[in-house]
């Protein structure tokens, strides 16, 4: 058995922090960003260094539910929860079906419909609110539909046209940005609940790529 006991070219392992947002909530922090992450982002922005934030879910909110009866809005074709996007539409990320955001619950007629969870769109909006001076790029399926848009976003970030790059797993593989000194994996345990017996392994792989 051959073991890798050190990194290639004697590369230094980065400092890794794991934050429990349940403890953050108890401390009064209701943000999607831990207090440590916010301080680290501020530090990098002040130094002129770049940041990458990874969340493996696009859209604005992970699902839409009725606050009265608990009904979750699902795709009529796939029977999975639909994702809310900032353009006011619900989309199925499996088959592509979409519809306008509902005003009343189809099960009980209640007008109390809420969005829950988070996606890359919500992260982008939160960054602009928390760090208004920062320039943010978002890279996911929604921002890379046009020809060459994938390369344009990466090139712009590499050239220093943005301080923070937010994206799904397409931002984590095969990229090397010299000025990136901070990487945040948001809701790192999200993929543990995927319908996949290798969910734990895949979650570890995605997290390890950043390190």
Feature map (PLM): residue ranges:
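Inter-lobe coupling/hinge segments of SF2-like helicase ATPases
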Residues: 1-208
């Amino acid at each position: 058995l051959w073991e890798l006991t050190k990194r290639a070219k004697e590369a230094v392992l980065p400092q890794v922090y794991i934050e429990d947002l349940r403890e953050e909530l108890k401390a009064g922090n209701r943000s999607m960003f831990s207090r440590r992450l916010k301080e680290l982002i501020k530090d990098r922005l002040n130094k002129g260094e770049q940041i990458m934030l990874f969340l493996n879910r696009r859209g604005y909110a992970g699902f839409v539910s009725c606050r009265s009866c608990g009904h979750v809005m699902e795709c009529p074709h796939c029977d999975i929860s639909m994702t809310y996007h900032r353009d006011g539409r619900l989309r199925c990320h499996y088959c592509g079906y979409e519809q306008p955001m509902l005003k009343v619950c189809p099960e009980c007629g209640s007008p109390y419909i809420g969005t829950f969870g988070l996606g890359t769109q919500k992260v982008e909006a939160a960054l602009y609110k928390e760090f208004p001076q920062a320039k943010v790029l978002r890279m996911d399926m929604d921002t890379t539909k046009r020809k060459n848009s994938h390369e344009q976003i990466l090139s712009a970030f590499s050239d220093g046209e943005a301080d923070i790059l937010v994206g799904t797993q397409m931002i984590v593989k095969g990229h090397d940005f010299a000025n990136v000194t901070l990487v945040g994996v948001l809701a790192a345990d999200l993929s543990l609940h995927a319908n996949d017996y290798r969910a734990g392994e895949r979650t570890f792989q995605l997290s390890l790529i950043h390190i």
